[in-house]
Amino acid sequence: MEQTLSIDGKKYNLLYKGKTASIYRDCFNRDLLVDIQEVQIKFGEAIEKNVREGNPDRDPYFVLLQANGSLFFERLVWVCIKTYDTYHGKETKAFQDFVDEIENYETYVMSGVVILEQVINANKATVQNESDEVTSDDKKKEV
């Protein structure tokens, strides 16, 4: 997944692929896929809690941020920028230096939320389950 993001009026190219996971691991000493799963689990639990408490219509982005905080989303945006830069021989500022210079922090973090959603949707199965497929021989038998 490759895209361009505008932060503080500056365009950044982002890239999410296998290399992203190794850069994330090297820079943050954490596993990206485990962190993504943890974010999803916390989000699901927060939705269930809101439903139990009579708040089923709360903004899902707010619920996601409230359940997980902003650090993961900061990291996700930065590591996707760093991945792109790595493939194109560019330098990326150190994570904390990069984040410290962001003027529009809310937009930066929300970009991470959108990227997470795209990553999750990009990894969903797009092929029909083989057990659900109907072969031409099966169709003939049904007639």
Each model region followed by its residue ranges:
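Short capping micro-motif at the N-terminus of alpha-helices
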Residues: 14-16
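Short, surface-exposed, low-complexity cationic segments
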Residues: 18-38
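Charged interaction scaffolds used for protein-protein
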Residues: 1-11, 34, 40-45, 52, ...
